[in-house]
Amino acid sequence: YDHTIERKYQALIWGIPNKEKGTININLGRSFKDRRIIDAFANNTLGKKAITHYKVIEQYHYISLIECELETGRTHQIRAHMKYIGHPIFNDKTYGGDKVVKGNKFTNYKKFVENNFKLMPRQGLHAKSLGFVHPTTNQKVLFESELPEDFLGVIDRWKKYNTSKNY
């Protein structure tokens, strides 16, 4: 893998990680049960090296907005790593984030979560930036992308939900 390529993503994940910043250094490889899924191999003897650095940007009680920087670029790396640490990506059907993972399962809250799934009917993962050194000019090139409307809409709803509840 090429360390000169800088990849940053933003993700909505279930729950709040124990640490505000962290590094997940766990090998990843195809699942033995379903080849479409990537599994984390904690013993690091199977799969390929995969390193994800993350930091929490904001917390909304049951979900968090994080930024991830990839040191390696494995298939489904962020999705598999977040599932491995118990914080699957919001509305990620493949890796278990498409149901109420954190919080109670009672009617009003469950409806609130399901409405957010409808507002953003995809996983809560966004490619924020891609940077590299141009091969002929040797200049650093950086492409950035703002969070899309559906993603921002879900964040806004969680902020409002957060302030409307007394914990």
Question: What residue spans do the PLM features occupy?
Answer:
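RNA pseudouridine synthases
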Residues: Y1-Y167
